[in-house]
Amino acid sequence: MSARRVTLNTRVSRASTSTPVGGASTSSRVGATSPTSPTRTSRQQEKEELQHLNDRLACYIDRMRNLENENSRLTQELNLAQDTVNRETSNLKAVYEKELAAARKLLDETAKEKAKLEIDIKRLWEENDDLKPRLDKKTKEATVAENNARLYENRYNEVNGKYNQSLADRKKFEDQAKELALENERLRRQLDDLRKQLEAETLARVDLENQNQSLREELAFKDQVHTQELTETRSRRQIEISEIDGRLSRQYEAKLQQSLQELRDQYEGQMRINREEIELLYDNEIQNLKAAANRAAQGSALATEEVRLMRTKIDGLNAKLQNLEDTNAGLNARIRELENLLDTERQRHNQYIASLEAELQRMRDEMAHQLQEYQGLMDIKVSLDLEIAAYDKLLCGEERRLNIESPGRPTTDSGISSNGSHLTASASSRSGRVTPSGRRSATPGISGSSAVKRRRTVIDESEDRTLSEYSVNAAAKGDLEIIEADVEGRFIKLHNKGTEEINLTGWQLTRIAGDEELAFKFSRGSKVLGGASVTIWSVDAGTAHDPPNNLVMKKKWPVANSMRSVLANADKEDVASYDRVRANVSSHTSRHRSSGTPSTGFTLGSGAGSTGVRSLFSLLF
């Protein structure tokens, strides 16, 4: 509390001169030469008394005339001063009312703008909250698309590797097919040679079979001829035997039989040897031909089977290669489509992110601009409050000095609460000291006197003013928020902006004020309904305990210049906070005025709006 010192020095000097209007004082001298009678003596005394009374009456009349003239002059001066004061007061009142109306209009516009800004900020926060999930969703979709693109790219690399491997296998199989074709051609030529050999062997076999048949027929013919010759020889020998001695016949027959048997054995042995040789040679040739034919047939069949298998394998590989080429073409088309889609999605996502960032930047710039405008309006309002308060003090002082009855005015609170700021003006006291000093000298004459007055008043005033400003910052993660925390530590108010009921069992509300900290833990069964509020009162607030909307704790909330209120849930996670910081703003005002020509100057110290106060007071006074 700063003191306001007012020093009023009044110096009044008046010089009066007495101008005799008529008559002179006569001294009655009573001669002692003649004897006086009592009647004469009484008459002389009465005459002297009448003369003295006449002199006094003349002085009184002169004094009354002077006083009436002075009174008339003072009345005119007073009327002129009253007219001047009334005119100045009317002008001051008009200017004050005009400035007050403008200030009220500006305050209303500021309140409307503040409400509009709060609505816009809330809408922007809601839009931001709505856009954040969409941004997260789009980011997740972009991440999934990138993962799919990488997956498809990996698949494409695998398919491309398989395709390259298939091309290598195809080239290898083509080389093998060429080698097999050459081998097949060689085997075909070998088969032709074997067929020719088989035909030659078949011809040789036929020739051998014909020779064998010829030899058999020849042998049969010789056997028949031999048998016929034997028969003829027997018949001749029989005839001869019949003619020879029986003994000789028997010897001869025995010898003949032996010779024939030897000859037969010889021929049969020779025939058997020849037959065995022929059969062995034939069998060998046949076996060789069969083996060669089997080898040729097996080689041809193997070559044919290999050619068929190779053709089948080549056809399968060609079909597989065609399928792989078709699959590769489809995958390439799909990859190009996905790449185009991914590029489009990336461009759209980047454009969306850019638009969101531009919108957020625009919103930040707009919020910063609106906050600057609001800060300017708050500064203007503070300066206007200071000007209005100083003007009200000065006007009250002038009204008291001029004994002007002013109509009752509603007192306005100097506290301001707007958009998280609270201003409180500390009451300022003003002490004044009026020191009138004057000098009046008058020389009364017999017939009267005239007086001239000069009055001069010097007033020095100074005023110190201190204002306290509270800046508020509130934040909430869920539906439950802290909407108000009393600066005097009487209560803290919570509000559920959602529609569902919130169970407060295990929740804790902590107040940190300077070095002091106090925690209030909600009891079991505490809750707050949707759209409702709950207030936690200090023990000295004088409020009854009425759950669930009014809760009274056993202690008092601490108070300091910097206060922080934090609401934590049952998991010890902070869900809401409310910060209030106090800042002091001081101002100094000085005023100097004289009674001749009012001249006033004001100087504001560190308070805001000193230029406006100076200009306003220069305009008013």
UniProtKB/Swiss-Prot annotation:
Classification via PANTHER family: LAMIN DM0-RELATED
Family, similarity comment: Belongs to the intermediate filament family.
Segments of skewed composition (Low complexity): 33-42
InterPro entries on file: IF_rod_dom, Lamin_tail_dom, Lamin_tail_dom_sf
Cellular compartment(s): Nucleus; Nucleus lamina
Assembly notes: Interacts with MAN1.
SUPFAM superfamilies: Intermediate filament protein, coiled coil region, Lamin A/C globular tail domain
GO cellular component, one term: nuclear periphery
PROSITE patterns registered for this protein in UniProt: IF_ROD_2, LTD
Annotated Polar residues bias: 7-31, 409-450
Feature type site, description Heptad change of phase: L281, E345
Ranges for region Head: 1-47
Stretch list, region Linker 2: 234-257
GO BP term, example: muscle tissue morphogenesis
Gene3D superfamilies in UniProt: 1.20.5.170, Lamin Tail domain, Single helix bin, Vasodilator-stimulated phosphoprotein
Residues bearing PTM Phosphoserine: S34, S406, S441
Motif Nuclear localization signal: positions: 453-458
Chain residue ranges for the region called Coil 1B: 96-233
Name of the featured protein: Lamin-C
Residue ranges, annotated region (Linker 1): 86-95
LTD domain mapped to chain residues: 468-582
Tissue: First detected from late stage 12 in the oenocytes, abdominal segments, hindgut and posterior spiracles, with expression increasing in stage 13 (at protein level). In stage 14, also becomes detectable in the foregut (at protein level). Stage 15 shows expression in the epidermis, dorsal longitudinal trunk, pharynx, esophagus and proventriculus, with the dorsal pharyngeal musculature showing expression in late stage 15 (at protein level). In stage 16 embryos, also detected in the exit glia with increasing expression in the somatic musculature (at protein level).
Listed SMART domains: Filament
Gene name linked to the record: LamC
Region (Disordered) location: 1-47, 404-458, 585-605
